[in-house]
């Protein structure tokens, strides 16, 4: 997963 941080931020609870 390349830009997973942009697609799905780590703020997913």
Curated annotation (Swiss-Prot):
Actins are highly conserved proteins that are involved in various types of cell motility and are ubiquitously expressed in all eukaryotic cells. The lineage of its organism: Eukaryota, Viridiplantae, Streptophyta, Embryophyta, Tracheophyta. This is Actin-7. Belongs to the actin family. The gene is SAC7. GO terms for cellular component: cytoplasm; cytoskeleton. There are at least 16 actin genes in soybean. Its main location: cytoplasm. It is found in: Cytoplasm, Cytoskeleton. Keywords: ATP-binding, Cytoplasm, Cytoskeleton, Nucleotide-binding.
